[in-house]
């Protein structure tokens, strides 16, 4: 969404451009999951029997919240053409879901559902970036990314974005990197987008999705060894970003 204006591709054209790199990332992820976790020697079991699906307790509530998700996705896609703001789409979907719970299961609505700490943290990151830009972040990103519109520039953009994402967060990292990419270099800009989406899996704060995942792991008392997380994330960030950028350039 942050990249929509600069990339300047219609929804279908953007999906067609990114589809193959996305498949490359998924393939790399599956290979690494097999290497690190799915192999018989690693899992310690002969077979894996998945648990039975949880039954739907309230089909009306399930349908209403499902409709809220579809509304959100539809509004995002429509917003590319109509200018609907992300905040408006998110608010509308949230209102539908909250009203549904208020009618069907009011006890489920509680302040603890809102990730207040993460909201403050991410907001703070966006405030930090302008300060860092005043002290040379823009110059540093331009030096790292360069102006080459070819393969070297694409690789530099992807890995610079991935690196800064793991230091700060991928949202401000993309904003900082975007300003360093020359306007005509579309492949370099898409490579930056790839790096800031595939790469931030090394540190817990690399992306909002990872922060939310860690938060729910904590709530459910699921222990995540930090050493394993960092090592596996490093391998995935490097190989996944390289594969995605390679396919992006080959299919461009």
Predicted regions span which residues?
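Alpha-helical membrane segments and immediately flanking helix-loop junctions
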Residues: 1-7, 159-185, 189-220
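Juxtamembrane and boundary regions of transmembrane helices in multi-pass small-molecule transporters
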Residues: 3-4, 9-60, 198-252
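Alpha-helical transmembrane segments in multi-pass membrane proteins
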Residues: 4, 17, 21, 25, ...
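Interfacial loop-to-helix junctions that mark the boundaries of transmembrane helices
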Residues: 11-22, 56-61, 78-91, 110-115, ...
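Catalytic cores of large soluble enzymes that bind and process phosphate-bearing ligands
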Residues: 24, 59-62, 66, 120, ...
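Long, contiguous bundles of hydrophobic transmembrane helices that form the permeation core
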Residues: 26-105
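Transmembrane helical segments that form the transport core of multi-pass membrane transport proteins
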Residues: 71-187
């Amino acid at each position: 969404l942050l990249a929509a204006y600069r990339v300047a591709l219609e929804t279908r054209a953007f999906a067609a451009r990114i589809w193959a790199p996305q498949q490359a990332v998924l393939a790399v992820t599956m290979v690494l999951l097999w290497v690190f976790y799915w192999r018989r020697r690693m899992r310690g079991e002969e077979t894996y029997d998945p648990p039975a699906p949880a039954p739907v307790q309230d089909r009306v509530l399930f349908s209403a919240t499902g409709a809220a998700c579809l509304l959100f996705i539809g509004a995002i896609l429509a917003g590319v053409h109509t200018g609907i703001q992300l905040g408006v789409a998110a608010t509308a979907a949230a209102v539908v879901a909250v009203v549904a719970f208020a009618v069907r299961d009011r006890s489920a609505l509680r302040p603890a559902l809102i990730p207040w700490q993460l909201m403050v943290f991410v907001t703070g990151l966006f405030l930090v970036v302008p300060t860092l830009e005043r002290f040379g972040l823009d110059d540093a990103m331009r030096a790292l990314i360069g102006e080459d519109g070819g393969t070297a520039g694409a690789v530099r953009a992807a890995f610079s974005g991935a690196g800064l994402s793991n230091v700060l967060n991928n949202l401000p990292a993309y904003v900082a990197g975007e300003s360093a990419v020359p306007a005509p270099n579309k492949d370099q800009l898409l490579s930056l987008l790839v790096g800031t989406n595939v790469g931030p899996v090394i540190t817990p704060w690399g992306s909002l999705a990872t922060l939310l995942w860690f938060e729910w792991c904590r709530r459910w008392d699921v222990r995540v060894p930090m050493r394993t997380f960092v090592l596996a994330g490093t391998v995935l960030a490097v190989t996944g970003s390289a594969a995605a950028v390679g396919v992006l350039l080959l299919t461009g």
